[in-house]
Amino acid sequence: MGKPAKKGRRPACLLPLAALAAGLLWAGNFTVGLTEVSISSGKLPAAFEGFRIALVTDLHNRVFGPDNDWLVARLEKAKPDLIALSGDIADEDSALSSLSALLPRLTAVAPCVYVTGNHEWRMKNRAEWFSLLEKSGVRRLSNRFARLTRGESEIIIAGVDDPNGPRDQKTPGQLLREVKAAAPEDYIVVLCHRNDQLENLANLGTDLVLSGHAHGGVVRLPFLGAVFGTHYEFFPENTEGVICCGETCMVVSRGLGGSRRLPVRIANRPEIPVITLHCKKT
């Protein structure tokens, strides 16, 4: 007769694998990666060669490390000249305590600009959130634009509020016409939440678009990429990276937080793209 099988061996062998899977899942949701992106343009003034923009989006009030120390440390490491907050930093049902501590630390790293995301227009404490941004020194570009200067040179950063906002708010077309009237030759960066505006903004004369919203597709699979779209359709496009339309490029961040209905990210680590601008020789 053969020796009886030892009970419990197989489950015990699976424990290290389960621990590894849990660790990878945790790291894939609560650690932050920096993604270096280079964008070149013949329109960029020489004074802005090497200008760095950190794109922070879709935090949804998630906390990375004690008091968001890990998130701030990543931004300090990136050494940005500007931090662009492209919406859904807050979440519709969350308290603002962690963000009230975080925002002043962000503005201590670099000047910050902000546009709304779709969830922030659903907040019951939206007025408190907007007030907190102002008190923390974050500049809200609510369908407005600002000039960024270096020496005697300038570029434009324009902010497009999310369409979940007021029905009578200024359209991207109206905003870009104002920009073109004020600075017809300037390099134009548009900060917006949604990742579906590239063609429209390209036609309006934008040079660079910074966006988020897609959460990188929430789940990413080898060879297939993003699994879920923002309307829960399968295998959406333009959920991360650099996408170009003519001379206009859009940087889409995978973002930092989780979807409300699909809160767990899989093979989709939270990220902060850091965009370095370069002068392209013509």
Predicted regions located by residue number:
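Short, Asp-centered acidic motifs that coordinate Mg2+ and/or phosphate
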Residues: D81-L82, V113, V138-R139, I155, ...
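Conserved beta-sheet core of the metallophosphoesterase superfamily
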Residues: V113, N195-P273
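Beta-strand-turn-beta hairpins that frame and shape the catalytic cleft
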Residues: S40-A54, R139, F145-G159, A183, ...
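Membrane-embedded segments
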Residues: A47-R144
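N-terminal membrane-anchoring alpha-helices
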Residues: M1-A47
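Short, flexible loop segments at the rims of nucleotide/cofactor-binding pockets, characterized by
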Residues: L59-F64, I89-D93, P163-Q169, Y187-I188, ...
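Catalytic metal-binding/acid-base residues of hydrolase active sites
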Residues: H60, A90, H119-E120, F145-A146, ...
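Binuclear metal-dependent hydrolase catalytic cores centered on His/Asp/Glu-rich metal-binding motifs
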Residues: F130-S131, K135-V138, R144, R150-C192, ...
